[in-house]
Amino acid sequence: MANLRKTHPLLKIANDALVDLPAPSNISVWWNFGSLLGLCLATQILTGLFLAMHYTSDISTAFSSVCHICRDVSYGWLIRNIHANGASFFFICIYMHIARGLYYGSYLYKETWNIGVVLLLLTMMTAFVGYVLPWGQMSFWGATVITNLLSAVPYVGGALVQWIWGGFSVDNATLTRFFAFHFLFPFVIAAATVLHLLFLHETGSNNPAGINSDADKISFHPYFSYKDLLGFVAMLLGLTSLALFAPNLLGDPDNFTPANPLVTPPHIKPEWYFLFAYAILRSIPNKLGGVLALLFSILVLMVVPILHTSKQRGLTFRPLTQFLFWTLVADMLILTWIGGMPVEHPFIIIGQIASVIYFTIFLVLAPLAGWAENKALEWT
């Protein structure tokens, strides 16, 4: 059996990725989030498949079909609650995974990192089109506001928006295509994940010390397979607890009202995991400027490897940049809070300051801190 595992063309690939993979002996729980994201994706595809069996992508029946799933389909309420809250857990894991990458310098594996950023963008697009499907008030107005941002593109903006809408407003054609996209994208994400892993296994994992770990490697199975399983149990426990005890905690009450193009909700806002980017978008009083800031708030991750100035890889022994990292975490929490607040004083100015700090840390302060730490090393 051991021989077959290493010789069979298909099993050999799985073996090299999940059984005999040499892994650094000192990787911490922060390295669990990659496998947790795989679990999230599998959960979302599975629950989404069962929801798609009962959902209808027509504006006259979409809202009712979601009600029908929750009331009449066997365990439909559970499947829907796990799917809706699974998205939140997906993004919690993504943000933790990215934070780990930033803290320990994993971004220096450039190909893996860049595909990761593409994966983040794909996941954000998937979550956005998925939020439109229940056809509640926030679904409709969220779709209207966010797709309208494309009208800021010079010259072709107006045509672009109408092309995405499939008409002159968010209507039946929009809902139908968004459902098609929402069904397709998770499989694109799965394919990109395979690439992400392919590039990662070219170099092997980074580790908390940020140094070469070839001298001290252990096999993935049983050590990290069981460690991952423990993470799976912890996350599934959290997800099912949320889905069973407080399924609407992270949702918007406006989405319990069927979509009405004639009534605008008092505060249009996306799901909590997009609020930081939404706050950056709103902090700039110019439409095109806001859209560019929104885009760059994610794409700034692509320039992190280029702006790495330190001689050390991670932040384990770099107190200056550690301080900047935790400032960035606090700044993102502030942006998340501001994104959910109305556009009025003092929230406007707080959002603008937080947005400036966000970009300054990435583009100016972190490279400077790395340079300063190099100098400090020379003095000692």
Curated annotation (Swiss-Prot):
<feature type="binding site" description="axial binding residue">
    <location>
        <position position="182"/>
    </location>
    <ligand>
        <name>heme b b562</name>
    </ligand>
</feature>
<feature type="transmembrane region" description="Helical">
    <location>
        <begin position="288"/>
        <end position="308"/>
    </location>
</feature>
<dbReference type="InterPro" id="IPR005798">
    <property type="entry name" value="Cyt_b/b6_C"/>
</dbReference>
<keyword id="KW-0812">Transmembrane</keyword>
<keyword id="KW-0496">Mitochondrion</keyword>
<comment type="function">
    <text>Component of the ubiquinol-cytochrome c reductase complex (complex III or cytochrome b-c1 complex) that is part of the mitochondrial respiratory chain. The b-c1 complex mediates electron transfer from ubiquinol to cytochrome c. Contributes to the generation of a proton gradient across the mitochondrial membrane that is then used for ATP synthesis.</text>
</comment>
<keyword id="KW-0999">Mitochondrion inner membrane</keyword>
<feature type="binding site" description="axial binding residue">
    <location>
        <position position="83"/>
    </location>
    <ligand>
        <name>heme b b562</name>
    </ligand>
</feature>
<keyword id="KW-0830">Ubiquinone</keyword>
<feature type="transmembrane region" description="Helical">
    <location>
        <begin position="33"/>
        <end position="53"/>
    </location>
</feature>
<feature type="transmembrane region" description="Helical">
    <location>
        <begin position="77"/>
        <end position="98"/>
    </location>
</feature>
<dbReference type="InterPro" id="IPR048259">
    <property type="entry name" value="Cytochrome_b_N_euk/bac"/>
</dbReference>
<keyword id="KW-0472">Membrane</keyword>
<keyword id="KW-0479">Metal-binding</keyword>
<feature type="binding site">
    <location>
        <position position="201"/>
    </location>
    <ligand>
        <name>a ubiquinone</name>
    </ligand>
</feature>
<dbReference type="GO" id="GO:0005743">
    <property type="term" value="C:mitochondrial inner membrane"/>
</dbReference>
<dbReference type="GO" id="GO:0008121">
    <property type="term" value="F:ubiquinol-cytochrome-c reductase activity"/>
</dbReference>
<dbReference type="Pfam" id="PF00033">
    <property type="entry name" value="Cytochrome_B"/>
</dbReference>
<dbReference type="InterPro" id="IPR027387">
    <property type="entry name" value="Cytb/b6-like_sf"/>
</dbReference>
<keyword id="KW-1133">Transmembrane helix</keyword>
<feature type="binding site" description="axial binding residue">
    <location>
        <position position="97"/>
    </location>
    <ligand>
        <name>heme b b566</name>
    </ligand>
</feature>
<feature type="transmembrane region" description="Helical">
    <location>
        <begin position="178"/>
        <end position="198"/>
    </location>
</feature>
<feature type="transmembrane region" description="Helical">
    <location>
        <begin position="113"/>
        <end position="133"/>
    </location>
</feature>
<feature type="transmembrane region" description="Helical">
    <location>
        <begin position="320"/>
        <end position="340"/>
    </location>
</feature>
<feature type="transmembrane region" description="Helical">
    <location>
        <begin position="226"/>
        <end position="246"/>
    </location>
</feature>
<dbReference type="InterPro" id="IPR036150">
    <property type="entry name" value="Cyt_b/b6_C_sf"/>
</dbReference>
<comment type="similarity">
    <text>Belongs to the cytochrome b family.</text>
</comment>
<dbReference type="InterPro" id="IPR016174">
    <property type="entry name" value="Di-haem_cyt_TM"/>
</dbReference>
<dbReference type="GO" id="GO:0045275">
    <property type="term" value="C:respiratory chain complex III"/>
</dbReference>
<protein>
    <recommendedName>
        <fullName>Cytochrome b</fullName>
    </recommendedName>
</protein>
<keyword id="KW-0249">Electron transport</keyword>
<keyword id="KW-0349">Heme</keyword>
<feature type="binding site" description="axial binding residue">
    <location>
        <position position="196"/>
    </location>
    <ligand>
        <name>heme b b566</name>
    </ligand>
</feature>
<dbReference type="GO" id="GO:0006122">
    <property type="term" value="P:mitochondrial electron transport, ubiquinol to cytochrome c"/>
</dbReference>
<dbReference type="InterPro" id="IPR005797">
    <property type="entry name" value="Cyt_b/b6_N"/>
</dbReference>
<dbReference type="GO" id="GO:0046872">
    <property type="term" value="F:metal ion binding"/>
</dbReference>
<dbReference type="InterPro" id="IPR048260">
    <property type="entry name" value="Cytochrome_b_C_euk/bac"/>
</dbReference>
<dbReference type="InterPro" id="IPR030689">
    <property type="entry name" value="Cytochrome_b"/>
</dbReference>
<keyword id="KW-0813">Transport</keyword>
<keyword id="KW-0408">Iron</keyword>
<keyword id="KW-0679">Respiratory chain</keyword>
<dbReference type="Pfam" id="PF00032">
    <property type="entry name" value="Cytochrom_B_C"/>
</dbReference>
